[in-house]
């Protein structure tokens, strides 16, 4: 019986070692794939300024620039990126409002990654207010985010960028045709 037990534990150790080797190879290949996707996509994506804080009152659908604060680098340039990963940390909804906290992963304009903590608070009263805040996370480890989800989101952003550019180009073409058709005397 002891001999069977020893063989069993040896087999477990052997399988664990093989599993770790396979897992390490998967991580390496996933990281190479992600790096290649970022390298290709970063030239096609339209990156947006990342807000630090914004407040919305009375359920208005419009944001006013004085109600939004953005992140800036040490040179005063706005940080730009796209949200490519999200992990919900907490969520609470009650009779008067609610709040949620997420960990977010952004692909930055320079191809680097930045992890943020996102907090949203809202109320349901007649004078509704929604408050959204982001802070740069202390832990910048991106391994907790799903690589397949990140790649899917990057591809969607490239598609969104294409749609936006085509729409804007078509608007400009219309404007150009209109201007050309006007007679200037």
Predicted segments — roles?
Residues 24, 31, 58-59, 75, ...:
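Detector for Asparagine
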Residues 6, 12, 38, 83, ...:
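Generic low-complexity, intrinsically disordered sequence content enriched
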Residues 1-58, 62, 181-185:
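Leu/Val/Ala/Ile-rich N-terminal alpha-helices, chiefly Sec-type signal peptides and the beginnings
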Residues 4, 14, 33, 61, ...:
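Arginine residue identity/basic-tract feature
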Residues 1, 9, 29-31, 64-65, ...:
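Serine/threonine-rich low-complexity intrinsically disordered regions
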Residues 120-184:
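Mid-to-C-terminal oligomerization/interaction "stalk" domains of large proteins
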Residues 42-127:
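Amphipathic, interaction-prone secondary-structure segments
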């Amino acid at each position: 019986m002891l001999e069977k037990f020893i063989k069993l534990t040896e087999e477990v150790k052997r399988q664990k070692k093989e599993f770790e080797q396979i897992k390490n190879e998967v991580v390496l290949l996933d990281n190479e794939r992600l790096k290649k996707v970022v390298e290709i996509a970063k030239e096609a994506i339209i990156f947006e300024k990342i807000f630090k804080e914004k407040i919305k009152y009375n359920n208005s659908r419009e944001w006013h620039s004085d109600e939004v604060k953005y992140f800036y680098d040490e040179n005063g340039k706005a940080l730009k990126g796209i949200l490519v990963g999200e992990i919900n940390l907490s969520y609470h909804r009650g009779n008067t409002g609610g709040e949620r906290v997420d960990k977010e992963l952004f692909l930055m304009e320079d191809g680097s990654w930045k992890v943020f903590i996102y907090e949203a608070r809202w109320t349901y009263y007649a004078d509704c207010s929604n408050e959204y805040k982001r802070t740069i996370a202390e832990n910048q480890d991106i391994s907790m985010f799903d690589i397949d989800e990140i790649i899917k989101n990057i591809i969607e952003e490239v598609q969104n960028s294409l749609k936006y550019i085509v729409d804007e180009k078509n608007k400009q073409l219309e404007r150009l045709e209109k201007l050309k058709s006007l007679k200037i005397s």
